[in-house]
Amino acid sequence: MAREKTERVVFTFHTTTMAMKMEQAAKETGKPGRLIPVPRQISSGCGMAWSAPAGDRREAELLVREYGIETEGVYELLL
């Protein structure tokens, strides 16, 4: 049986370094989310993306600014 899709906010990055920095920042602050392969619907320079519940978009955007993480794009998708 297929898993139910949920709305997610997805951040893409130009480099793997920035993707890993996002993962580390989220772990340090206890924010939800995880690294995923970039979904087919979008493209990214490094092939890795950060996925978090769509309701946590504002918190994730604050984390990006606070830690100086450079993103390529931000999307809301059903994943």
Give, region by region, the residue ranges found by the protein language model:
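Short glycine-/aliphatic-rich beta-strand segments at the starts of folded cytosolic domains
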Residues: A2-T12
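Long, contiguous binding/interaction regions
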Residues: R3, T16, E59
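A short linear hydrophobic-aromatic micro-motif
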Residues: P32-V38, E72-G73
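C-terminal structural segments of small proteins and small subunits
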Residues: S51-L79
